[in-house]
Amino acid sequence: MATARLILSLLTIGLSRARVEESPRRVLSQNQSQVFVNLARLPIATPACSAARWGRVLELVHHLGAAAHEISAKFRDEGFWGVFGSHYHGAKVNFMWNAICNDEQLANKPSLQVCEIGFNAGQSAVLFLESGRETRVLSFDLGDYPWNKKQASTVKAAYGERFDIIFGNSLETVQNFVAKNKDFKCDVAFIDGAKTRQIRNQDLKNIRRLSTVGDTLLLFDEATTMECMNQGDCQSTRQNHNSWGGATLAYYDAVSSGLMKILDCAWPVGMEGADGVCKARYAK
């Protein structure tokens, strides 16, 4: 009888261990978009801009990236084609987060309206949405990747009325939005759409129409050198005009014309002078 009880106890322990070991696998096999939505809907107990809140952002972004990969295997990296790309080692997103959290002018606002050109998989939108309880995000995106629209639906399900997106060519959609919403203003604007000089120039000008001179915090990606953007030597940038260089030459144009003033930039280690992110304000 004692032997039988011992065998039964061992079997029970074995089954319990099996259940514990299976639990992580069940979590990983869940639909990642739903995991993201459930997590985003949890009550926020951490202060805005705290280290704990940033940890929440990273967890949300992880699941949102996994959701994009479930849609298409082409979304290969957790932050594929975006500022959360693993090869940036957090340099870009940390700069953006700190730019918002440490800006004295933004600190005086009860809530923020963020506008971005370039939604991709929605990870930058989540960064902005998590920066404050009442922060709202309006995204403009071409919608030409297989994950764009499903990811937008996922972010919408998580944040409701705080998030909206308009699909189409930003050269048309932003202007159309301005024409119909003349009093709408962005407290923060992030430009990370098409990389060519011509289109980036127009995106800067269009977003200016949704901004307040000297007040709206402007963030932009694909910066090569501070020297070039501030009307200095652009030789290396011009040689790279078919890549990020096109965007940087647009920043050169914007500074030269007095449209904006660059405040600061950051580059991932090993990418200095090649692919950074900056903050600025419109000057006129």
Language-model features: locations:
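N-terminal signal peptide
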Residues: 11-25
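Classical eukaryotic N-terminal signal peptides for Sec-dependent ER targeting/secretion
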Residues: 1-8
